[in-house]
């Protein structure tokens, strides 16, 4: 495929993952529990945790875009073509990087495992969405 088409696929995967992440952290899903655990862990207040979308969304988009580019490069290099392989690579990337590095806060900074699980559930879901979209659109 051409570079323009590939970039479009990467952008769509990024946006889809962000939308899923936004739903994940809504109050009616895991948002209320996440907020409660984050306040307990960090000492932040409700005011500290008020969304600042003009600042937060562009940063979240940028880091998710980096992830999608890396997923694209890995899937392309490994010639991943099936749905099952897409989900396997998503799990492998999450387990090898997201799960391992994010566990440091639980191991060394006494972050509660429940907060870690909420965040890592989102990471895994977003990784799976990115991988699935990019592999199925190849």
Segments (PLM) and residue ranges:
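Juxtamembrane/disordered regions of integral membrane proteins
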Residues: 1-138
């Amino acid at each position: 495929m051409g570079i323009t088409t590939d970039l479009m696929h990467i952008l769509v995967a990024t946006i889809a993952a962000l939308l899923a992440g936004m739903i994940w952290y809504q109050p009616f899903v895991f948002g209320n529990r996440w907020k409660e655990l984050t306040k307990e862990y960090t000492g932040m207040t409700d005011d500290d945790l008020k969304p600042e979308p003009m600042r937060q969304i562009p940063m979240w988009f940028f880091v998710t875009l980096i992830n999608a580019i890396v997923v694209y490069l890995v899937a392309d290099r490994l010639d991943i073509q099936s749905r099952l392989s897409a989900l396997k690579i998503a799990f492998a990337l999450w387990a090898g990087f997201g799960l391992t590095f994010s566990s440091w806060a639980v191991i060394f900074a006494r972050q509660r495992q429940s907060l870690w699980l909420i965040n890592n559930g989102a990471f895994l879901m977003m990784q799976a969405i990115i991988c699935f979209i990019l592999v199925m659109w190849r």
